[in-house]
Swiss-Prot record:
Record InterPro entries: Aldolase_TIM, TAL/FSA, Transaldolase_3B, Transaldolase_3B/F6P_aldolase, Transaldolase_AS, TSA/FSA_arc/bac
Species for this entry: Clostridioides difficile (strain 630) (Peptoclostridium difficile)
EC number: 2.2.1.2
Keywords tagged on the record: Cytoplasm, Pentose shunt, Schiff base, Transferase
Example of a GO biological process term: pentose-phosphate shunt
Main subcellular location: cytoplasm
Pfam families for this protein: TAL_FSA (PF00923)
Function: Transaldolase is important for the balance of metabolites in the pentose-phosphate pathway.
UniProt entry tagged with the keyword Cytoplasm: yes
Catalytic activity: D-sedoheptulose 7-phosphate + D-glyceraldehyde 3-phosphate = D-erythrose 4-phosphate + beta-D-fructose 6-phosphate
Pathway: Carbohydrate degradation; pentose phosphate pathway; D-glyceraldehyde 3-phosphate and beta-D-fructose 6-phosphate from D-ribose 5-phosphate and D-xylulose 5-phosphate (non-oxidative stage): step 2/3
Protein name, as recorded: Probable transaldolase
Length: 216
């Protein structure tokens, strides 16, 4: 499993990139709006930090508008991936963009059927949302397992990005199932780094070292 960071905050992206664990970034209109900055400027700055796929989402809900926006965004940097909502209009846009060699990430997927259609339309990535399904008392990880199985059996090349990740369990279970990528907030990355026994071990080592009056 590979890791993307799910944010439009430049400082968070820099921090995660410095850890050496991420190889891409996903954004959405809500994350961009939260930063209160120009959309294009933010995407350009991200592309200067992370050398990997950067998902930037279209705003139009009509396929012709999606295609126009996608062509504009794709010119920002070679790593730009166009994020398209899972709708009939979105699928039309994905088909056209795929034929032009523009990579797409179909987002807001909540069923295996949606993932399969997106892949067949030509999506480079599909993004099923785990946490939001959990929020309505469904098991989001069940969806990941189902999509992984379907894609494997049918030799589908579209990559699965596990999205709406709320905790390390989402990441680890999805990794065990064989999902390609998890896009996670910095908070979850930090939760995965920490373990109380690691902290305890470091404290013990330092006390022993200082007690022996040793120098490196």
């Amino acid at each position: 499993m590979r890791f993307f960071i799910d944010t439009a905050n430049i400082e968070e992206i820099k921090e995660a990139n410095d850890l050496g664990v991420i190889c891409g970034v996903t954004t959405n209109p809500s994350l961009i709006a939260k930063e209160g900055r120009d959309f294009i400027e933010v995407v350009k700055e991200i592309s200067e930090i992370v050398d990997g796929p950067i998902s930037a989402e279209v705003i139009s809900l009509e396929h012709k508008g999606m295609i126009e926006e996608a062509e504009k965004l794709s010119k920002i940097h070679k790593n730009i991936v166009i994020k398209i909502p899972m709708t009939a209009e979105g699928l039309k846009a994905v088909k056209v963009l795929s034929s032009k060699g523009i990579k797409t990430n179909v987002t807001l997927i909540f069923s295996a059927g949606q993932a399969l259609l997106a892949a067949r339309a030509g999506a480079t990535y599909v993004s099923p949302f785990v946490g939001r399904l959990d929020d309505i008392s469904q098991n989001g990880l069940d969806l990941i397992e189902e999509i992984v199985d379907i894609f494997s059996v049918n030799s589908i090349e579209a990559q699965i990005i596990v999205a709406s990740v709320r905790n390390p369990i989402h990441v680890l279970q999805a990794a065990r199932m064989g999902a390609d990528i998890a896009t996670v907030p910095l908070k979850v990355i930090n939760q995965m780094i920490k373990h109380p026994l690691t902290d305890k071990g470091i404290d013990s080592f330092m006390k022993d070292w200082e007690g022996a009056s040793l120098k490196l």
